[in-house]
Amino acid sequence: MSVKIRLQRHGKKGKPFYWVVAADARSKRDGKYLEKIGTYNPNTNPATVELNLDSAVKWLHNGAQPTDTARAILSYKGALLKHHLDGGVRKGALTQEQADAKLTAWLEAKAGKVDAKKDGLSKAQADAKAKALKAEKEVNDKRIAAAAKAEADAIAAASATEEAATEEVAEAAEEAPAAEENNETTEA
């Protein structure tokens, strides 16, 4: 029986979530599988991969062929390296302790790279948030200054119209007695 290590799709439309499974090569994409090896979530950044390393290496030893994406996932988690190092142990080129030391060193280096990427992404996100907040504060300050200027202009215009109205009332008051005098002279 030909066995493949491949992805089995789960999740909903537009939000894929995959199981990494060992399945018969003739079975359907989402059909029966022999063993679930792990999960792969491409929706997160960086993608989340959980893998049972020993189970994956066991299937590789038994001759399972990974698909292209599954091969990339196995390589990312170190399953292919462990399979390669186990081959060296079987041939006598390495001892098991040396192989384990190489694998743990590689896994630690890989974890450091992944953590650095996560830190970089969180720092970039925080910087973008701070920059957006600064831009929003500048816009708010401009808006407040424009509102204060408009209010001051409105007050100045109101006081100018008030002064003009008082001047008109004063002129009207001066004209009214003059008009009354004119009326008295015309009656006489």
Curated annotation (Swiss-Prot):
Keyword annotations of the record: Ribonucleoprotein, Ribosomal protein
Family assignment from sequence similarity: Belongs to the bacterial ribosomal protein bS16 family.
Domain of life of the organism encoding this protein: Bacteria
Gene Ontology terms: biological process: translation
Cellular compartments per GO CC: cytoplasm; small ribosomal subunit
NCBIfam families in UniProt: PRK14521.1, S16
Protein species of origin: Flavobacterium johnsoniae (strain ATCC 17061 / DSM 2064 / JCM 8514 / BCRC 14874 / CCUG 350202 / NBRC 14942 / NCIMB 11054 / UW101)
Region (Disordered): 155-188
Protein name per Swiss-Prot or TrEMBL: Small ribosomal subunit protein bS16
InterPro entries according to UniProt: Ribosomal_bS16, Ribosomal_bS16_dom_sf
Biased composition annotated in UniProt, kind: Acidic residues: 164-188
GO molecular function: structural constituent of ribosome
